[in-house]
């Protein structure tokens, strides 16, 4: 659903190619270094926020794994939907389309902050707003620093996939 407005209003309407939303080559070493740094910052922020929430007996997000079914089939479905398709679509829309449009009208600082805010708010759960805001800023920063959407897609996909894998392993160890 997120890719349709990008294609219809952005690409088709203006006769643009997918490179205009960030599908461009990038320096692999730079992308890897910046991607690892973004991941480390994201994990640090998430851990700190989780510790703050634990003081109030709250969690950042509910366990989404049961929504995909049980067992290994549920894990595979979660990895496909939440680890590949979701991050791809979200990055194309929020960074490739929305952030790129913001950069035409706003300073880098305001475009990063507004993109992070919109990305957080769309995820609905208030206890998850701070870490998701941080992710939105970091993913937009990756696009800005590498000139390509691919590093943000890879890091986003890695974070979501790792989360599902850890939930799955955690459930198995708790049995």
Where are these regions (language model features)?
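Membrane-interfacial alpha-helical segments at the cytosolic side of multi-pass membrane proteins
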Residues: 95-106, 164-170
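Interfacial helix-capping/hinge residues at the ends of transmembrane alpha-helices
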Residues: 18, 95, 99, 136-140
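Membrane-embedded alpha-helical segments of multi-pass membrane proteins
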Residues: 1-2, 72, 76, 80, ...
């Amino acid at each position: 659903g997120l890719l349709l407005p990008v294609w219809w209003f952005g690409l088709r309407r203006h006769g643009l190619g997918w490179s205009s939303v960030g599908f461009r080559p990038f320096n692999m070493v730079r992308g890897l270094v910046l991607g690892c740094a973004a991941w480390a910052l994201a994990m640090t922020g998430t851990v700190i926020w989780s510790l703050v929430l634990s003081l109030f007996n709250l969690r950042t997000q509910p366990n989404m794994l049961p929504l995909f079914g049980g067992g290994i089939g549920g894990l595979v479905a979660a990895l496909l939907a939440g680890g590949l398709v979701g991050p791809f679509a979200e990055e194309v829309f929020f960074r490739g389309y929305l952030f790129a449009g913001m950069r035409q009208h706003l300073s880098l600082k305001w475009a990063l902050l507004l993109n992070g805010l919109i990305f957080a708010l769309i995820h609905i759960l208030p206890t998850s707003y701070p870490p998701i805001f941080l992710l939105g800023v970091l993913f937009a920063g990756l696009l800005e620093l590498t000139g390509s959407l691919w590093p943000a897609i890879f890091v986003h996909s890695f974070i979501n996939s790792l989360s599902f894998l850890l939930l799955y392993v955690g459930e198995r160890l708790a049995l």
